[in-house]
């Protein structure tokens, strides 16, 4: 069986974008924001579908704001992950490192919890291996 390479520009691929959101705590350590989605009972990184005529970067900022309430600034791209979603659709999610600059989390139907964790603890808490791998490949 041939391996299918997913391209972000492929019209049959669902494009998503999100953020690895960080802040520096009072002791100078990096903490990452991860979210809990009750519909899936998972811990993941904030992300969502790229709308038509929306850049992936704008989508990432919008989705992070919608899901976390945080205002962020993009620092750099972190890479993309390709996978098949729960409905059997091909999906490519691209992520950017973002610094939280303000805002406040409010629990909702889509996202009911946000936690700030050390990089090591965030990797342990995340549900999906693809999210864990993305963080493990970074130098925070």
Predicted regions and their residues:
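Short, solvent-exposed loop/turn segments that connect beta-strands within catalytic domains
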Residues: 24-31, 87-88
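Acidic, metal-coordinating catalytic segment for phosphate/diphosphate chemistry
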Residues: 1-26
């Amino acid at each position: 069986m041939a391996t299918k390479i997913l391209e972000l520009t492929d019209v049959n691929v669902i494009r998503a974008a999100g953020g690895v959101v960080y802040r520096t705590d009072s002791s100078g350590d990096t903490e990452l924001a991860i979210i809990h989605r009750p519909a899936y009972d998972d811990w993941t990184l904030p992300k969502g579908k790229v709308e038509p005529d929306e850049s992936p970067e704008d989508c990432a900022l919008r989705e992070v704001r919608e899901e976390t309430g945080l205002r962020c600034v993009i620092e750099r791209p972190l890479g993309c992950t390709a996978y098949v979603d729960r409905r059997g659709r091909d999906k490519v999610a691209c992520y950017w490192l973002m610094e939280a600059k303000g805002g406040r989390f409010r629990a909702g139907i889509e996202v009911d919890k946000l936690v700030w964790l050390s990089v090591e603890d965030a990797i342990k808490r995340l549900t999906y291996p693809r999210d864990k791998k993305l963080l493990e490949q970074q130098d925070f």
